[in-house]
Amino acid sequence: MKERILVTGGTGYIGSHTVVELQNSGYEVIIIDNLSNSSADVVDNIEKVSGIRPAFEKLDCLDFAGLDAVFAKYKGIKAIIHFAASKAVGESVEKPLLYYRNNLVSLINLLELMPKHGVEGIVFSSSCTVYGQPDELPVTEKAPIKKAESPYGNTKQINEEIIRDTIASGAPINAILLRYFNPIGAHPTALLGELPNGVPQNLIPYLTQTAMGIREKLSVFGDDYDTPDGSCIRDYIYVVDLAKAHVIAMNRILEDKQKDKVEVFNVGTGRGLSVLELIHKFEESTGVKLNYQIAPRRAGDIVKVWADPSYANSELGWKAETSIEDTLRSAWKWQVHLREKGIM
C-alpha cells in the first residue's frame, strides 16, 4: 500500500507542484485547502499533469474538528507537509492578527492531532524571512534568527519554535523545517502555476500580468537600497526544484534517516538577483518588454538575502538545477496559457 501524506494548502502555488512530485514518487496524497487563495480546478490540473487524482477536502486548518475528521476518514496518514498559511509580507503589516491566527493556530491544531492519529512527521514550510537582514551573506542555517521585519516573518519564527517546543516536550513527532527563499516559475506543462485570487501580492505574477497588459505597470518598491542598482536582492528558486526538496525531506523522515528530531535546511539557489536584474532577465528571456516604475519602499522588506544551500546539497542530495532564464520563461508560458484559456 502506498504511504499516505496529508498536504495542507495543496491547491496553492507551491503545494500543487509538490503534490505532483509526491504522486510521481509513489505517495498517496490527501489535500486539504480552504481555497482562500486558490481554486478547486487545481485538483483537475494536478490529475492532468500526474495522471493521478489526489483526494481533496475543502477545509480550513483552523477547524480543529474538521481536521480531526479528515485524519479519521483517511486512516494511516504517515506524515504532513504543511503549506497552508497567509503569505504576503505587505498584507501582514496591515492585518497582523489575521496572520497570527491563520498561521499559528493552523499549525497548533495539526500538532495536537498528530499523536492521536499516529502521524509520524511534518515537513514545515518555513521561510528565509526568519533571518531578517542577515549579518553575513550567503546565509547559512546557523545564522542567528533576527527580530522579524513583518508579522508574516514572525509567524514563521514562532511556528519553528512551536515545533521545537512540542518535540522537546516528548511528542512522538519528527520534523524538517525547509526555509525557502523566493519560489517563482510554473510547471513545464503550463498546467500549474501561481494564480492568486485578486491583485497579486508576489512579484512574478504581478510582473507577468503587467507583461500581458492586465496590470498597467509594475512597481519596483525602492531603488535607494544599499545594493548595486538600489533595488532589493533575493534568491529566486524554481518552484519545481523546491517541490522536489519536499519529497526528499519526506523520504528522509519516513526512512528514519534524520540526524535530529528537528532538522533545518535552506532551500535556495545560492545566487542573489536584484528586482531590476530580474526584470531585465525576464525581458531578455521572453522578448517581452515590461512597463515598470520606481515606487517608495514597502514596509517589511529586507534589503538583500540569498541562501547558502550547501547543507541541503550535501545532506539531502538536493540542488536547485533550473536556470533563472528557464524559470522566467516557464512563468511567462503559464501566463500565456491563462490568457488562452480565458482565465486571465
Each language-model region and where it sits:
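Residue-level signal for pocket-adjacent positions within structured domains
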Residues: G9, A84, A88, E94, ...
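C-terminal substrate-binding subdomain of Rossmann-fold SDR/epimerase-dehydratase oxidoreductases
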Residues: Y206-M344
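N-terminal Rossmann-like NAD(P)+-binding domain of SDR-like oxidoreductases, especially those catalyzing
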Residues: M1-A186
